[in-house]
């Protein structure tokens, strides 16, 4: 196998993984669970310090298994009943009794959450205080930086017990640094690599498909998927391929943001973006009668394409990543429909022309609306591309897909930092 292909597999396996709940509050739960494991006694106080962007993405989203919103309950639940070994599924086995105990800490004023200027968009430090049987106070502290589970330092009783070496478990945003990767290389890899090497990606279809079913069958969030289904049944809209994709994708996001106790297969630290990279591709695979192997290749194309595009700008920025994720999904949809590589590039260009610039104003139930908007753009871009229509040389969309991707990165890094600060100020007012 080519060295670059081995790197692609490593990248996918590093950042396409199951996650239970919105990954920003879950990062706090994970840090708290690791700290609790180290503490060795019952925690009686928590201090949580996070970056502005992690705070933004935790303000309005339900924490699975708790029925509650926010960083305080996420961290407290992680400290009381989290499983540090489970990573982003840290709260999978949380019990009602443990949630009640976590809430008691909050009600007693023993969970403090604050923001700080941080070196990375993803930053979380959790410090626990506890008392042993003799009444002696102990402390444990865990710091995450650059990734939702990337521990850079641990302390026990104020003594450093672990420090990540430089480059160890590198920050998520740098994951493609030094890797020979491009849209053309991704397309070649996805279509030519041995099927057995990528069979694992089919778990994305299974996990995110179950979330979609959950959102269709039960009331979560804004019920966008269920509302579309009701409108189809009422004859107000038809169940064509676009509406089915939007409905199924939004339903999965409804369930995720509404606190469903089911994991999503995430992408680049985002469950919604994992959903956006998966469900549209699965629906098109069903429409064209694709084989299991063809679906796996399309999912690899979609997920790795999304990772590559998103590596051009910081995670948790002011830019909603569902746009570029849906662009990668559109590329994969073209493949499933028998289109050419050139048409796949058209699809990416079309989607980025359609919806690039959508802002992120925090994780919340209405993220499902942005997911539905992006998935609709993916279908439009895909259908235009199948007819060999592609946007070129207009606005931020350049004459070739690689330059367009670089332009998006520049727009986010250089043009949207003030937007990000303004959004956080508005939300915190």
UniProtKB/Swiss-Prot annotation:
InterPro entries found in the cross-reference section: Ser_deHydtase-like_asu, UPF0597
Coiled coil: none
Name of a matching Pfam family: SDH_alpha
UniProt GO BP: L-cysteine catabolic process to pyruvate
Disulfide bonds: none
GO terms for MF: L-cysteine desulfhydrase activity
UniProt family annotation: Belongs to the UPF0597 family.
Protein name: UPF0597 protein AHA_1619
